[in-house]
Structures are given as C-alpha cells and as structure tokens.
Design a protein with these regions (language model features):
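Terminal domain-start segments
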Residues: 1-25, 118-141
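Short consensus segments that form the blades of beta-propeller domains
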Residues: 8, 37-44
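Short glycine/acidic-enriched loop and turn motifs that connect beta-strands
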Residues: 35-39, 89-90
Length: 141
C-alpha cells in the first residue's frame, strides 16, 4: 500500500506534506498544504488534510477533506478515528465500506458562543487525549 501511496504522492507539489495513518482499520494517506511546525521536514502538524484510501481493486480513491480551526486544534487521531476541532466544535471521522471506502462523520458537536453542551465538553476532553498527526514533506516511511 505504501508503495502505491508513494507513487501517488509524486503528483503533489513541493508544498504538500504527507502522513500515513490507520483509520477505522484501513490504511490511508493524508495530504496537506496547510502545515505548521518548527522544522521544515519533520514534526509538522496540519490544519486541514485530504484523505486518500485504496478500494478493493487497489486503486486510490479520494475520501474527502477535513479542517480544524487553528493551530490549537491540529488534525489528530484517537481510537483509529480522525479528529478536528475549533473553539466551538469537535468532529470525529471514520471510514466505512469495504469495496469502495467512504469517509463518515462518526460524531459532531458544536455550540453557540456562550453555551457548551455536556457532549461537546466530553468531546473536547477526548480531543485533548488525541495524538496530533505528524506530517512530513518526505515520504520515506
């Protein structure tokens, strides 16, 4: 799978950063042009990412894109799910489907400026436990 993803990654410009992940027990390639960090080639985190997976024929399919709301909330993973957040929302994404995988929203909570629900507070606590995805400009793993 990684060789297929590596070959595919050559289609992106030099500003693209990449990460491999396992989401809902499916290998995916994450591609972002919106990364930040202290080092140009390592330890980068992303504000947004496009998600690619392999279908049952081994062909790459685009699952979609997700976006967080600032550097406090980088694209993260917890329990084999992708997570993004902002000041007033948290979204959790998984992948469903065997032959033709699809991105699915597992959970989404948001609130107005003044009132955070118990559910949203619980999701923010989960987000704090999530591990930010580490992106690199080099596909060498």
């Amino acid at each position: 799978q990684n060789e297929v993803f590596k070959s595919f990654a050559q289609n992106f410009g030099k500003s693209a950063a990449f990460a491999y992940a396992n989401i809902s027990n499916k290998p995916v390639l994450l591609v972002s042009h919106e990364v930040f960090g202290n080092d140009e080639n390592e330890e980068l985190e992303a504000l947004a990412t496009s998600i690619f997976a392999l279908d049952s024929d081994g062909k790459i399919v685009t699952l979609g894109s997700i976006r967080s709301q600032g550097t406090l909330y980088p694209v993260s993973i917890l329990d084999n799910k992708l997570m993004v957040a902002g000041h007033h929302f948290v979204s959790v994404y998984g992948i469903r489907g065997e032959g033709e995988p699809e991105l699915e929203i597992v959970c989404h909570e948001e609130s107005d400026m003044n009132n955070h629900s118990k559910e949203l507070k619980a999701l923010f606590e989960k987000f704090e436990q999530a591990k930010p995805v580490t992106f690199t400009h080099l596909l060498n793993k």
